[in-house]
UniProtKB/Swiss-Prot annotation:
Coiled-coil positions: 95-137, 180-415
Bias (Basic and acidic residues) ranges: 44-55
Gene this protein is translated from: Myzap
Mode of membrane association: Peripheral membrane protein
Taxonomic source organism: Rattus norvegicus
Keyword match rRNA processing: no
Chain segments carrying region Disordered: 1-66
Family assignment from sequence similarity: Belongs to the MYZAP family.
Protein name: Myocardial zonula adherens protein
Amino acid sequence: MLRSTSTVTLLSGGSAKSPGTPSRRANVCRLRLTVPPENPVPQQKEKKIERKDQPPELSNGESTKKLPQGVVYGVVRRSDPNQQKEMVVYGWSTNQLKEEMNYIKDVRATLEKVRKRMYGDYDEMRQKIRQLTQDLSVSHAQQDYLDSHIQAQASALDSFNAMNSALALDSVGLQKTLVDVTLENSNIKDQIRHLQQTYEASMDKLREKQRQLEAAQMENQLLKMRVESSQEANAEVMREMTRKLYSQYEEKLQEAQRKHSAEKEVLLEETNSFLKAIEEANKKMEAAELSLEEKDQRIGELDRLIERMEKERHQLQLQLLEHETEMSGEMADFDKNRYQQLEEASASLRERIRHLDDMVHCQQKKVKQMVEEIESLKKKVQQKQLLILQLLEKISFLEGENNELQSRLDYLTETQPKTEVETREIGVGCDLLPSTTGRTREIAVPSRSYTPYTRVLELTSKKTLT
């Protein structure tokens, strides 16, 4: 069993007032319970709501007093810093609880109306309102529980106050969103009004244009009637005008033919010069390729000569090594002649080896020079190829211009007006020069047995192998 000491304190509102005023019953009853620290109690706050119709009995010998009726008491258990457990009892009137519950009902009704208004506009607002309705259903269940048992907990009012503040904040947010929506709707209405005004203005302009078009059509009909009436009178004038126009057109056609022939001759001269340049470039390329082949053959011969020199040098070095080993061995007096012969032979071998080294070095220099010449020839061949390609592009461009001029001339001859004049018939004929496009196309670039790029690859592979 737990040992505890309890203290009951009754507060009355009439003690602080003047004696003339009527006394009021106390509406607060506090019960203080102190629990010893031996028995551990969890740190959580436990709330109990009790309805007391009878006053509690006092354990300290004080006289019992009748407590006020219709008061709800809440017991709160808490711990102080001195490791002692305390229980405090708070009391509220039923009128206060009813007012709080009515306030919650009103807030719930207003939120339900706002939710119905905003339903379908914003998904996030619907989720929030759904969450608020769930919270309100929970609070309604708590309210029913409080109404059925007529008990209130001490922390219930705090939670209700927090919930009310949250609901107030949500309602403020909903009002802000409603204001924003109304502002957007007003802006949309203004835009629609502006569009209607512009539409009406454009319709007025369209009607005006239609009226002008009708007036122009009427004028055209009148002009047609006048033209039809004056056609017979102006037939001779029209014939004269057609003759003049036809003569002017003939002059323009002849001038165009002369220009075409002159431009054609210029183009032919340019193409011939380009073809000559291509032939010269091809000849130079063939000469360069022949020189490349000769250089390749010469390099091959030099490579074989260097290989033979290397073999001979290797053999001479072996002979020198044998002579030196024989000379390093022990020799008697009668072998002095042999020793001198070996020294002379080794000296001659060293001289021959030095001479071979000089020759190999000289041949390698020659090979290097020839390789550099081959590289320069390759670059020249590439430049010639680029020049040939550029000349071929220019020739194709000139052929395109020639074809374009020919097509223009054909178009002019085809679109020549063939009006029949009553007085005389005029026919114009012109002899066109034969086209030389076929002749220019028949000139082909001289064929080669191999391309320069493959030759360059072969030479580079030979260089890497050597």
